[in-house]
Curated annotation (Swiss-Prot):
It is an enzyme of class 1 (oxidoreductase). Pfam families: Cyt-b5, FAD_binding_6, Mo-co_dimer, NAD_binding_1, Oxidored_molyb. The keyword Kinase does not apply. It comes from the Eukaryota. Homodimer. Nitrate reductase is a key enzyme involved in the first step of nitrate assimilation in plants, fungi and bacteria. Residues 520-595 form the Cytochrome b5 heme-binding domain. Belongs to the nitrate reductase family. Binds 1 FAD per subunit. It catalyses: nitrite + NAD(+) + H2O = nitrate + NADH + H(+). This is Nitrate reductase [NADH] 3. Keywords: Disulfide bond, FAD, Flavoprotein, Heme, Iron, Metal-binding, Molybdenum, NAD, Nitrate assimilation, Oxidoreductase.
Amino acid sequence: MSTCVEQPTHSASLDPTAAQRLPYPDLPVDILRRSSVRGSGFVAAALVSSARKADDDARHDDDDPSGDRHETYGSHYLANLGVEQSVRDEGTVDAWVESSQSLIRLTGKHSLNGELPRLMRHGFITPVPRHYVRNHGPVPRGDWATWTVEVTGLVRRPRALTMDELARDFPALELPVTLVCAGNRRKEQNMVRQTLGFNWGPGAVSTSVWRGARLSDVLRRCGSMSRKGGALFVCFEGAEDLPGGGGTKYGTSITREVALDPTMDVMLAYQQNGGPLLPDHGFPVRLIVPGCTAGRMVKWLKRIVVAPAESDNYYHYRDNRFLPSHVDAKLADAEGWWYKPEYVINEMNTNSVITTPAHNEFLPINAITTQRIYTMKGFAYSGGGKKVTRVEVTLDGGENWLLCELDHPEKPTKYGRYWCWCFWSIDVELIDLLACKEIAVRAWDQSLNTQPEFLTWNLMGMMTNCWFRVKVNVCRPRHGEKAGLAFEHPVRTNQPGGWMAQQKHLETAERTSAATSTTNQQFTMSEVRKHASQDSAWIVVHGHVYDCTAFLKDHPGGADSILINAGTDCTEEFDAIHSDKAKELLDTYRIGDLVTTGGAEQRSPLELAPSPPIRHEGPAAPVIALSNPREKVPCQLVARTVLSRDVRLFRFALPSSGQVLGLPVGKHIFVCASIDGKLCMRAYTPTSSVDEVGHFDLLVKVYFRNENTKFPDGGRMTQYLDSLPVGAHVDVKGPLGHVEYVGRGGFVIDGKPRKAGRLAMVAGGSGITPIYQVIQAVLRDQPEDKTEMHLVYANRTEDDILLRAELDRWAAEYPERLKVWYVVSQVKRLDEWKYSVGIVTEAVLRDDVPEARDGTLALLCGPPSMIQSPILPNLEKMKHQLDDSVVSF
């Protein structure tokens, strides 16, 4: 076989294990040599073998009725990969993993979830570093020499297979397979109504040549039992530690029939495009289930269990489900929709995308261009091994359809299966586009499955395969220039814009104008940035501009919560911490819409690529870590102490060992993390002293899944932190809050100074932490600080009382400064409990906190239900002025 591959200049960058040299040893040379896809995973994208048994001694004579299967799929699909600088996730637990800067990151810095913008430029086979990535958490470190895959359950010969055994003892299968995330094109659904998923564009699809051992061979070698023996499913589990379900691995399952069916080509893959798997793609071994949602293809595979039932893993039930459109998150939880088998996603549906014309592409109109032919292009795919047999384009809303030319580089398998995407193209006269308002495409497969005209919204935003529509507008790009045709895609990946965004803005404006007198003004981002102060605080959420200045004094979290994002697009952070009710309230403050300026490069979301980052030598780290409230500060987990079944003490190191956190007493921070692909932010108050250098401590009560019927999923952030390994990073942001203790009875509340000689403190559960900070500050300034503190602290049980040892010790050492009274809902031995049982009643408050008089301030922090009733009504009975002398953190 002879193949011409254009070589990049710097050959050193083409080392097949360059991206994993530190954490991984090279694969054994004899294993690499067996692949017909020569070279590394970086450049072997040029070479594609057909679906076949790769070992000559294992091939069937009739595997290749059409001739030599070692030929390439055509040099015209070969793209010059070039040499690009890999980037690392600095400041995260995945800092050791190299990833392509070409990928558009969709969920922040970590974990990596990204798609390739210049998808079709690389042809039929996607270069490994540019293959789309879907990670739920940190990337496990693997070692070929020590890694094993356990095969257990309903098998007669359970065993732990080494990587050498998988690669040498089983006939190798090698074939190209297109992987697609079931959430591909999800951003289109999110423009209609927000789903539970993040904004995939149309690029969550990639194709590689995978090599591995057939799963059916492995199961037969281990003696898989029959259906009569109870074997109905095969379950898979990866190695990564994830927060879902209170802490688990990623797991899922397929039916036994699919696992053992030789026509389905299910494999345990250990090579991709002729080289070892890269860390982000599952090194050293992953599952490949062709034609299926990639959510079944477990990476970093560690366990295979033949079982009588499908996987009970959290991610098997809470991901890759296509629920009916009427089911929202509350209904899904309340009625158990997650567990209904008829809504599980396995085979992918039929889909197609337009890549040419690109988004913002402009075609001038003149006497010459109107005589030209314009070639439209795109790609299409289907699931279940079905061949895409037809792609059609309409220029008139579906009244008439034009048949496209198909390009199928893939050859069918021995059993007639097609596991890969194909390309389509069609020539149209430019003059025909002048009367066209919209271009739409649809594909058909061999079972005559096609794409619906409109999308079907569903809770997880899965299986978006409606017609892909590109709007056509006659416009003049700049004053004085000639008119032409401008094309607009439905959405832009990880950027504002697209005709669906404009449509949503118009619909929202129509609804809002009926209820308010808001003008539909348009603002640029540069105008918004000018309004970033207490005098004028604007924010952008989902493309709308809001003037929140009037709400600064009323925000429950204080003005800081708004000012920290004033002048910015804070869509992701707003969605991460606000309820639907808060989102409705926001409409009151809408003043217009955000517009993007012209002059953008005329390229599609699938063609745009981010510019390489410009690295500057930064100044020395500031003494205060939280020197800029608008910036997130990466902090590394350096210690984790288990204090009880559900209480943890976490110590996080600051970026510099000489820094202090810089959090004023009474304020809090946001801890930020990407959990299941979505930003999650929660407020915490450190328990460490504000003077601590180099680190801070968080005391966290973990709310586990299925322990509270009202919140069956438990706490997203607390479970995430509980599963976080030492060495991992989280981002913190702050300070925030409207209460600050400045010492010796002095407070600043909503920006106004306040003096208090007596503090009536009421805390519930983990709400003790900001009050604990105030107590700590008062007692640290003894004997100068004369403030008297009276604390009533409520919990469910005695074991739930946080920081009790410290509180009791301080109360004993400073009886004139601090008095503590506990209230619990239930006790083990009533005769041994000297405090109150039940709820915080008026009698408890009258006995244990001071009544209202000059110099008394009530500080509250706890669950809203507790604060609203009984605390506030009872304090009001004690003559406390709720709008003056009562403050909630």
